[in-house]
Amino acid sequence: FDHPAEVQTLLAPFTTHRFFIYGITELSSPVDKGHLHLRPYSRSGFLRDLEDCNGVICGAGFELAGEALQLGKKLLVKPLRGQFEQLSNALALEKLQLARVMQRLDRKAVQLWLELPPNVPAGYPDTAQLITVWIENDHWQDIGSLSQEAWAQTGRVPRWDGR
């Protein structure tokens, strides 16, 4: 993970936005530095701030990115170096136009991301029910129809560029 001081340096110029930076192990209580709000681990505080925010800047792991998308938060991810899963997730999020990606802490990427409009919440389908109906209707050879139905229910049909 990036050092909290580097993250603060990255976000410091954007004084018209408030940033809540979580997981700072050196802190035992919250510290506010103007528009930068430094927070120790707090599940309840984190969930409250996640619900109230406009967007999330995070690693490209699945859990937080998925929560942010489900809540309709715009997303800027930075894959952790050497983590193949995170590189793969970042590529998928970018190709599906669900997130912006930065490979390093990049002030210009943050600025462009901050200018984006908010996302809409992702409506994830009941995939177990979709699969049940798909099998019951003997459509198991046509995985494309299952995929299309699931994506249609999210309201975010992916746009692949063929690569």
Predicted regions: what they are:
Residues 46-88:
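A donor-sugar binding/catalytic signature common to diverse glycosyltransferases
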Residues 6-13, 67, 71, 113:
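A short acidic, amphipathic alpha-helical/loop segment
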Residues 111-163:
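C-terminal amphipathic helix plus adjacent low-complexity
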Residues 40-41, 74-116:
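Nucleotide-sugar donor-binding patch of glycosyltransferase catalytic domains
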